């Protein structure tokens, strides 16, 4: 499989090279809108009908019972439990460190302003199932929700045709203290959390990855006054490597990204043409040892190897592209990292593969894709809170800023605003 190599492209060519795979269509929008409407109107009945239609699953009880949870946890090997436990510990440590103290400041005499982080009461987590049940995502979403103090955490995940949820997903959920787990997947699960059904409660904010139907459902959920973590598209990695980089490391980073899905995109940026020319062969050699080769090949088909003149150009390209994952596999990694302003998560040095962040380093793997890192952050503790501001003014405090408020209100022709100050100051 040959990855396209582009040498020294002019800046006018960059937008073409930066294009992501986009699958937004009117048909997709309409299909999801129909699912949303069906769930809104028919509730649990719609969830059962849609599970049978799309997944061939005959659903019984939608909720995972305590007995099912225990049975699933008993099935998880001790080795995997230990791995999940270590990952959970690191993720919890990093997210606990993000706690912010309440802010209080006197802006002028007698005027006190405060800001307090308040947890979102009820959040919904979507965990994909299918061929790659993402139990790691349970940790990435469930642990911050618990640390933030969300009192109600609802989780939806599809079950298999045997009616069972993946055992590792349930073990990870128990690790996070999640007990409200429902057997529902796809766009209909998002609809259930956005609208509420007889069994699944409506939530205030929805988190989690998924296919294009899930992503479209999350976008449409916002019409129902439900917040989402972020817009999302296919996963992506950008690798910056110098002439000293081990090609096996670079190739394995390409391949680990490519196995996320056929629309995933991997990009190498380098100023070393010789490295760029050798990389495709190493990719092919490692690919031959892996499963899912056909899907990986599709992903590599719209991936890029790009040779640029200077590191300044490399950084400009990185910041213009705004990658979900950025690997700096080069001697200048720390210096370059300080110049990165648009990226979801950055991995410094040869021993920092994306896989570490995907699972166990402690950072969150729910990150902005498709260029949204220009403005969005990855999921963090703040994602599960809202910031409420408070102000307390004494009479003297109001007197101190009263003339300013009255003058500004009058200039905006909002005379009732002016009056609200004047009556308090006996004017």
Locate the predicted segments by residue.
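N-terminal Rossmann-like NAD(P)+-binding subdomain of aldehyde/semialdehyde dehydrogenases
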Residues: 1-121
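Short acidic-hydrophobic, aromatic-tinged amphipathic segments that line or gate anion-handling sites
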Residues: 2-9, 180-185, 305-310
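Flexible, glycine/charged-enriched surface loops at secondary-structure junctions
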Residues: 100-107, 227, 264-269, 289-299, ...
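Conserved small-residue-rich beta-alpha loop and adjacent elements
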Residues: 105-171
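Conserved NAD(P)+-binding/catalytic subdomain of aldehyde/semialdehyde dehydrogenases
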Residues: 177-265
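A glycine- and small/hydrophobic-rich beta-loop-beta segment
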Residues: 256, 260, 268-343
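C-terminal core of ALDH-fold dehydrogenases
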Residues: 319-427
